[in-house]
Regions:
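Alpha-helical segment proximal to the catalytic Tyr-Lys
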Residues: 128, 172-173, 248
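Short C-terminal tail/terminal secondary-structure segment
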Residues: 97, 228, 240, 251-264
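Catalytic loop of short-chain dehydrogenase/reductase
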Residues: 92-93, 139-162, 167-176, 185-193
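Conserved mid-core segment of classical short-chain dehydrogenase/reductases
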Residues: 70, 91-109, 132, 152-155, ...
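Conserved glycine-rich cofactor-binding loop
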Residues: 7, 14-16
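A glycine/serine/threonine-rich, flexible loop-to-helix segment
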Residues: 176, 189-223
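Short, small/polar-rich loop/turn modules that mediate ligand/substrate recognition or access, typified
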Residues: 175, 180, 250-252
């Protein structure tokens, strides 16, 4: 098993990506600790893991609340001897598709503050334990907006580019202590549209051009080298690999899972 007996904390554990990653982590032998704001979504994710024989615990924790995150991570570390993997899969619905003249400061800052604050808070909480124990893996999730240009992307672009820069800098800081940091950059995830905030967000963007959401998503797929969008299980499987010892020389990297929308 890739993650046998690893202690993995997943913030945003009730969301589409967090729950999918948790399922794979548990299958690969990790003891999974899901944290998020929605108890029903956390319970649903945990139920699926338990049905497959996996080990999982849940906690209602707002990743914007540094004290709450610290208390939860510290409690997990005390009870289980440390933190091996920390994944931030927290998501924020936000405005895309509008020109800067039509975008309010609040709408611009919402994803920037949300993603950068929660990743700082969760990484800091985990790093404290990982550096003390001499190893661990911190996983972050970006978007193609970090590399794209064009109308309607300023908030998304700022948060994604900022998160990728944060991840690289953190990898440099924590590397001497044996801690790896890997950022994963997927594209729009087709099978997450029906279960996450992205469905409504993509619908709003499509509506700006009077395009049905399904057609808009098909257009996104057509702009990739593989002529398709990535899927949740592909991202989850990669996250498990990146968290495992098989990727022990990988750090400071942004893994491109855009199906070829971005060519690095």
């Amino acid at each position: 098993m890739l993650l046998e007996d690893k202690v993995a904390v997943i913030h945003g554990g009730g969301g589409s990506v967090g729950a999918a990653a948790a399922q794979v982590f548990a299958r690969e032998g990790a003891r999974v600790f899901l944290a998020g704001r929605s108890l029903p979504r956390l319970e649903a994710a945990a139920s699926s893991i338990r049905a497959g024989g996996g080990s999982v615990e849940i906690a209602v924790v707002d990743a914007m609340d540094q004290d709450a995150v610290d208390r939860h991570v510290d409690a997990v570390a005390r009870a289980h001897g440390g933190i091996d993997v920390a994944l931030n899969a927290v998501g924020f619905d936000h405005v895309q598709g509008l020109a800067i003249g039509d975008t309010s400061l609040a709408d611009y800052l919402h994803p920037v503050t949300g993603y950068l604050q929660t990743n700082f808070v969760t990484a800091k909480a985990a790093a404290r334990h990982m550096t003390a124990q001499g190893g661990g893996v911190i996983l972050t999730i970006s978007t193609p907006g970090a590399r794209l240009t064009g109308r309607g992307l300023i908030g998304n672009a700022a948060q994604s580019a900022g998160l990728e820069g944060f991840s690289r800098a953190l990898a440099g800081e924590l590397g001497p202590a044996g801690v790896r940091v890997v950022c994963v950059r997927p594209n729009a995830l087709l099978d997450a549209v029906g279960t996450s905030y992205t469905g409504e967000m993509f619908g709003r963007i499509a509506a700006l051009t009077a395009t049905p959401r399904a057609d808009w998503l098909a257009g996104l797929a057509g702009n990739t080298l593989l002529d398709r969008l990535p899927l949740l299980d592909e991202v989850a499987e990669y996250l498990a690999f990146a968290a495992s010892d098989r990727a022990r020389s990988m750090t400071g990297v942004v893994a491109n899972l855009t199906a070829g929308m971005i060519v690095d």
